[in-house]
Amino acid sequence: MAQTLSFNGRRRVRKFFGKIPEVAEMPNLIEVQKASYDQFLMVEEPKGGRPDEGLQAVFKSVFPITDFSGASMLEFVSYEFEPPKFDVDECRQRDLTYAAPLKVTLRLIVFDIDEDTGAKSIKDIKEQSVYMGDMPLMTNNGTFIVNGTERVIVSQMHRSPGVFFDHDKGKSHSSGKLLFAARVIPYRGSWLDIEFDAKDIVYARIDRRRKIPVTSLLMALGMDGEEILDTFYTKSLYKRDGEGWRIPFKPETLKGAKAITEMVDADTGEVVVEAGKKLTPRLLRTLSDKGLKALKAADDDLYGNYLAGDIVNYSTGEIYLEAGDEIDEKTLGIILANGFDEIPVLGIDHINVGAYIRNTLTADKNENRQDALFDIYRVMRPGEPPTMESAEAMFNSLFFDAERYDLSAVGRVKMNMRLDLTVEDTVRILRKDDILAVVRMLVELRDGKGEIDDIDNLGNRRVRSVGELMENQYRLGLLRMERAIKERMSSIEIDTVMPQDLINAKPAAAAVREFFGSSQLSQFMDQVNPLSEITHKRRLSALGPGGLTRERAGFEVRDVHPTHYGRICPIETPEGPNIGLINSLATFARVNKYGFIESPYRRIVDGKVTSDVLYLSAMEEAKYYVAQANAEMNADGSFVDEFVVCRHAGEVMLAPRDSMNLMDVSPKQVVSVAAALIPFLENDDANRALMGSNMQRQAVPLLRAEAPFVGTGMEPVVARDSGAAIGARRGGVVDQVDATRIVIRATEDLEAGKSGVDIYRLQKFQRSNQNTCVNQRPLVTVGDEVNRGDILADGPSTDLGDLALGRNALVAFMPWNGYNYEDSILLSERIVADDVFTSIHIEEFEVMARDTKLGPEEITRDIPNVSEEALKNLDEAGIVYIGAEVQPGDILVGKITPKGESPMTPEEKLLRAIFGEKASDVRDTSMRMPPGTYGTIVEVRVFNRHGVEKDERAMAIEREEIERLAKDRDDEQAILDRNVYGRLIEMLRGQASIAGPKGFKKGSELSNAVVSEYPRSQWWMFAVEDEKVQSELEALRGQYDESKSRLEQRFMDKVEKVQRGDEMPPGVMKMVKVFVAVKRKIQPGDKMAGRHGNKGVVSRIVPVEDMPFLEDGTHVDVVLNPLGVPSRMNVGQILETHLGWACAGMGRQIGELIEAYKANGNIEPLRKTIGDVVGDGPKAEQVHEFDDDSVLRLADQWKRGVSIATPVFDGANEADVNDMLRLAGLKDSGQSTLYDGRTGEQFDRQVTVGYIYMLKLNHLVDDKIHARSIGPYSLVTQQPLGGKAQFGGQRFGEMEVWALEAYGAAYTLQEMLTVKSDDVAGRTKVYEAIVRGDDTFEAGIPESFNVLVKEMRSLGLSVELENTKLDEAQAAQLPDAAE
């Protein structure tokens, strides 16, 4: 019999519809974050020291620091991290930052300086390790914990350093002429722009300042006019020949021209080209072949050319004409008169080569290097008088000083590629040759050669990940520190000082704190569900420091670019002002060492596709022909079609199969993780797919997670990489399981000194950043064998290791009494009764007892004027019990605050002295439940300041925690003992002993029975003859003792932390945190959605018996509006409905077969049915080889509905859907007859019914509904505040006022504008009137009117209100009364 495969039932098996085999492994989805930060910190120093990158590079760039006189120097040696004080969970609980102390070893060198010669000799060297603040560490999930909350540092997209050529698209000048410009962007330092103006003069700008002619810049680099012309133009020599001139024949400059006069060969005198003839390339080639070397020219043919060198009389030194002068009658006369018969001429023909640099040189007022340097100095530092030294130093510091200017390796690589240079990427400053190459290329662009750059190409944009952002921030901190160190080194007696006396690490620590706390890229992690966590970590933002701003970003930056293919998702981006500026990394993409995004491709060798995978960036990919992942192939890997659809240089085209070099790895490499989770994405309109991707991130984890029937195969990947489901770190056997932890005895990776036990703590009812509930449930049972990577426990929104954001619901597409108008959703009461869409939310309330001026606040049960009934949930310490059910207004923590003393009468003083304290000294400031929240207390934490006596509740919590730690220690100890003593007895068995415990007969052979007579602790006393075994025994003993002491030490450390007081904000004596779990059932007003952007609000919940039902009596759960599909073009939801219907139909069949098996014991029909469903695709499970137990486990998993995977762009097609429906015994129209639940009548026509995966989104009506009668008012305007958080009112705005004005509702309007809003006196009067039962009131002046008057007065306008009373006769004479 074939070897049976077993299936443990701990993972979900899916029927796979994908036809394209996946050759590349999908990289870990949060690798972007982890790899970047690891490279920055390099915690473990490698052998041979750390390379110059990350933190090491920062220290190397700032150190050594020399004092102003050069008498001492502070050098950097190395750095190391100490273990963090608190682990991740402790930091979360205590609101601390998870960080490790950074220790830097510095060396202070003091020199002796010889006063006469200035020679230095080393006088003293001191080395010391200095504490440089705490460096935040990344958790295993790629997040940081800052002040107790999880944060994510989002990667930033910015323009890559390097050189860019561009033009203004004809916008600057009215003629629409294209003005070309080049810009050299360094990583840090001054920007250099070189640009044309409308007159074709070339200018340079430094740091966007005033422009100077580019020739001045070149002169400042040490060139003179003639050298500049030599660099940019070719020279030719015109010789005098009789009356005319002999000029060289250069065919390359004459292409396409027309001969105005006849062309004569200077050597033979024959006419080679007639006047008026066009010079075709063929004709020019013929002339060259004939041996034409030079042409004859008259004087006027020379006019308009430019001299290539000075015309000098060498005997007298007189310069007649300078290089660059134009040749005309006058200048030619001077040349001939002085007897020159050879003229050097610049090769400028105004067609292929323009005279731009020559014209600039002529227009430039600066003659030499000094003038040019002074000019640049005046531009950069206006108002300062320049000297040669200061100008030279300033110019050098701009581009040629590594401290001030850094192109970075990326910039140098980009520059080399663009300008065809070959310079090492360690050369990080500009060179003269670089500037010349930039100017040369710019001039060539103006001459019509070459292309401008596309700045939105991903080859020109790079990603700055956490590590790099942190590196820049830390460098800023160190530079601030450097100034202070220099000053201190100069002002202090250096001989007696140690390095730590010079260093104040506060600026560096502050820079780090500022970055994590308030940078735009450090964001509060989106933790609604595992998918939102992963997407947040893979996000790319173009905003942030050094990036774009929303207002300035145009359409081009936001648009999808051809280079996004396989790198950035074209679908997932927010709707709204940030659209296109915040993107998501594609599934297979990764970031290379230079920060460019790379995508994987399969190599094609000799026309055959191999499994060899190659990662390329956008720049490298442009030169290849890349076939699509779904191109049809033969079995040997060659293409079926003669012409293949491919991409090349940003275009999609058909090309012959022989020209293909690469092929895409997978169809889903185009999209991001969220988009890859949408089945039938290819059938959805892009706008709706965008909404679908974004809404999956808002799905609330439900009470019972259920994986989708119709998935895409990405679900386990997301669950695993997000860290929501717990995977085994190494193989082993499950030793213990309960709801809070799993203990596994490892069977692999057993190194000496490494614990042989893995304890996995499960999170129970923890609060996430968005108040959703994080809860993990074990999937394994005692005795299970697990392999590395197996799923041990499900987390929030996961089901058997698959991401499960919602529930499968039976949906009918039909109208129902108008309750699904405008995308509303009609639900059955069954969904509420069975808690299908019920979720748990956890609210955190904290209360602090402070030390006030009038005395300390106190947390107590003894609260004045509160009934015993209100205190029923509090313990003797005044803190609510765990498990108490609370509702709005209930006290959670009782607290009293001392009241300000009012002066006392002598009688009161006497009474006080006699009867002691009076209850009126304190007021009740207890924490109560806010309005509208009901729930159950799930956790209470009490924090005490050092030295403050702990109350009974704090002690109880502490005892519980210590018991838990002791249990962990004891379990690990028990497994260790079992392992070690097991190995010990194995070693001793059959050995001849030479010593043993008291009363043992030496020399006898040891056996299990003999050894077992003695207590375990005495087994170590046995010694054996065999020396090898004896030494192994001793090694085992050493290892055992070491492990045991390590365990005990770890336990003691943890206990010490628990017992120690907590660090509190100043003035706080005690803090209590209370966590309340709120169960939210679905109700009208909650927002729901499918995965295809089909969102809606629940409009009504109908009794089950009134819902439409199928022929077998099953009532549908959800009724959706069929009109929501056609105009939105998200047909994927209909295909999902059909396929889900087929899955449920097959699940029903499998359920029936299970019942049959229970009756007759024959499992083969079940095995055959499941085998037929799974099929035989590339990823199909071998069900026919499963043992019987495994078949039953799989059948049990599938009886509610078969799970299938239809990957994006490679999923089930129409035929597959029809086959599945037939296999399930259903109609292939996918429609069913429905009956009205209220009348029992059949509906007129067939209705599409099936299963859709529905999500409940984090927009719950409970969080939004809000009512106010009286509440807080704004300080200045005295108007009610707005919003639920402020307990605000409803704004009656400008337009609403217009509406009342239009109706002439004067009294209503008056109320709205005065007593209901900001008439302070009127408000109280109305209240008093209502209390009296009187309904008359008088409106006064609104406060906002006073604000207006004050504002006008502040502008110098005296505004007075006249208070005059008129009688009726006077009133009648007013102008508007007469009309």
Curated annotation (Swiss-Prot):
GO terms for molecular function: DNA binding; DNA-directed RNA polymerase activity; ribonucleoside binding. Keywords: DNA-directed RNA polymerase, Nucleotidyltransferase, Transcription, Transferase. GO terms for cellular component: DNA-directed RNA polymerase complex. InterPro entries: DNA-dir_RNA_pol_bsu_ext_1_sf, DNA-dir_RNA_pol_bsu_external_1, DNA-dir_RNA_pol_su2, DNA-dir_RNAP_su2_dom, DNA-dir_RNAP_su2_hyb_sf, RNA_pol_bsu_bac, RNA_pol_bsu_CS, RNA_pol_bsu_protrusion. It comes from the Bacteria. Its EC number is 2.7.7.6. Pfam families: RNA_pol_Rpb2_1, RNA_pol_Rpb2_2, RNA_pol_Rpb2_3, RNA_pol_Rpb2_45, RNA_pol_Rpb2_6, RNA_pol_Rpb2_7. GO terms for biological process: DNA-templated transcription. It catalyses: RNA(n) + a ribonucleoside 5'-triphosphate = RNA(n+1) + diphosphate. Belongs to the RNA polymerase beta chain family. The RNAP catalytic core consists of 2 alpha, 1 beta, 1 beta' and 1 omega subunit. When a sigma factor is associated with the core the holoenzyme is formed, which can initiate transcription. NCBIfam families: PRK00405.1, rpoB. PANTHER family: DNA-DIRECTED RNA POLYMERASE I SUBUNIT 2. DNA-dependent RNA polymerase catalyzes the transcription of DNA into RNA using the four ribonucleoside triphosphates as substrates. This is DNA-directed RNA polymerase subunit beta. It comes from Rhizobium johnstonii (strain DSM 114642 / LMG 32736 / 3841) (Rhizobium leguminosarum bv. viciae).
